[in-house]
Amino acid sequence: MTQSLCKKGGLGRGLASLIPTGPVDADSGPATYGPQMGNTAADVLIGGSAQKDNAMGAVYREIALSDITENPCQPRQVFDDEAMSELVHSIREFGLLQPIVVRPASGSCGDTRYQIVMGERRWRAAQQAGLSFIPAIVRATGDDSMLRDALLENIHRVQLNPLEEAAAYQQLLDEFEVTHDELASRIGRSRPLITNMIRLLKLPIPVQRRVAAGVLSAGHARALLSLEANPEVQEELASRIIAEGLSVRATEEAVKLANHEVNRVNREVITPVPQRRKPICMPGLQDVAERLSNAFDTRVMVSLGKRKGKIVVEFSSVDDLQRIVDVMTTYKT
């Protein structure tokens, strides 16, 4: 127990020795944690620049958990219970090994409060661990940087599920009006990855929920996107994947078979079967057919189309054919 307390105390003193604590003297200029490259960590990747007039820098403080509120731009909506339990246990044993990042925010009664920029998971775990105060770096962060900072922290920690990551990418594209290529270069991700992740938002909502819950992987979801059918068929295949435990490869094969069937049905619907024209009925045709049948001693059919007619003489064998030819020759002579 003593060892744990020493670890906690040592960590706090180490951070405090590196980062200034307490209020900042306005005349002496802001105390900063490391080199100032911008108001936020995202400035380095997204391309922002700090304005000298409102640059506040970063200050280390121990802040009451009750004075901190959530990040409204937090892209992550699902906090894994098992991972959270492990973090809570670690905090109880060793303390919080990394401070969270917050920004000043006025309370409802004018009191000083703080809003999380990075570290909401650590803040939640500290509450569950029974801590009253939490180490934090207080840093001025604009509203337009809240989502960027939270997204960068989460994707580089691999904590977002595929749907949360896709929604965050889409929000960045909408808010900052950049292309997929520009966003990829600024956050250190490949353009195909961003494009493929955003495509997941086209899945039916029930399928999206299963991806967010981790029941379906991003690979399964991308395979379902290739299904050339209505959303109901995608949902049915998603249920089959879960029930049968299909691999991504097996899902891709199932999608190929389904697409082949859909294309076959579409061809049958689009290409009408040509209807046979009914022969023109004229008085006397049947009489001619009967007379020829009697003459050749075989079945003879006579039909008349729109432009031309046709006589069909049946025979049962080569000898029978020769017999009919002989009869025709006799009539000719």
Swiss-Prot record:
Keyword DNA-binding (UniProt): yes
A GO molecular function held by the record: DNA binding
Gene3D superfamilies per record: 1.10.10.2830, 3.90.1530.30
GO CC list: chromosome
Family annotation (Pfam families): HTH_ParB (PF17762), ParB_dimer (PF23552), ParBc (PF02195)
Signal peptide from the UniProt entry: none
Record keywords: Chromosome partition, DNA-binding
Entry annotated with the keyword Lipid metabolism: no
GO biological process assignments: chromosome segregation; positive regulation of sporulation resulting in formation of a cellular spore
Family, per entry: Belongs to the ParB family.
Function text: Involved in chromosome partition. Localize to both poles of the predivisional cell following completion of DNA replication. Binds to the DNA origin of replication.
Protein name per its UniProtKB record: Probable chromosome-partitioning protein ParB
Source organism of this protein record: Mycobacterium leprae (strain TN)
Gene: parB
